[in-house]
């Protein structure tokens, strides 16, 4: 284990043990994206950035620690723009969540014009499983760059030809992301 990870390990243990429910969760059920005629999992949660942008987050029942956000969203990219087309809860019943629960004044499908970021689409076989967030590593990752809802870039990374981060590195990365998400939820509730 590299020196900096040895120093961070006790901190990570303390954070994991003291962090409430969402950040101590398991690998997550991903959102879905219809892209080029194929429905694929995305290891990104674009809707969370909408809530982080001062819009109140409705209550979504959490049916599982594998779905800390309480919903699974289905997206599509059509004519270079990203749209939210469907939401369902994470309970055993997988009930449909009306998009109007979040977007009262927008037509469906909802154009994701609030989202700027990167969508990660895993491809190929899993090289390393990480039991947290979206930390697992696959043979390839397709990264789609979105700016204000518009697809502006696409890049494939071949993980078989690059150094695969250690499980500790992936876990620290996922813990950091989950902690940021949790902090944003708390801030929006205040």
Question: Residue locations for each model-derived region?
Answer:
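Intrinsically disordered, low-complexity acidic regions enriched in Pro/Ser/Thr
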Residues: 20-190
């Amino acid at each position: 284990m590299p020196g900096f990870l040895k120093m961070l390990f006790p901190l990570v243990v303390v954070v994991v043990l003291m962090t409430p429910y969402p950040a101590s969760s398991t690998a997550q059920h991903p959102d879905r994206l219809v892209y080029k005629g194929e429905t694929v999992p995305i290891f990104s949660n674009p809707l969370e950035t909408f809530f982080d942008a001062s819009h109140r987050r409705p209550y979504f029942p959490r049916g599982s620690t594998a779905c800390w956000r309480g919903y699974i969203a289905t997206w599509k990219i059509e004519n270079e723009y990203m749209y939210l087309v469907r939401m369902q809860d994470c309970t055993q019943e997988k009930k449909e969540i009306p998009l109007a629960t979040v977007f009262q004044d927008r037509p469906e499908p909802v154009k994701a014009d609030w989202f700027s970021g990167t969508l990660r689409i895993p491809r190929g076989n899993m090289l390393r499983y990480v039991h947290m967030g979206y930390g697992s590593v696959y043979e390839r990752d397709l990264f789609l760059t979105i700016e204000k809802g518009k697809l502006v870039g696409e890049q494939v990374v071949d993980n078989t030809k690059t150094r695969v981060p250690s499980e500790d590195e992936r876990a620290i990365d996922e813990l950091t992301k989950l902690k940021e998400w949790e902090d944003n939820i708390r801030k929006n509730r205040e």
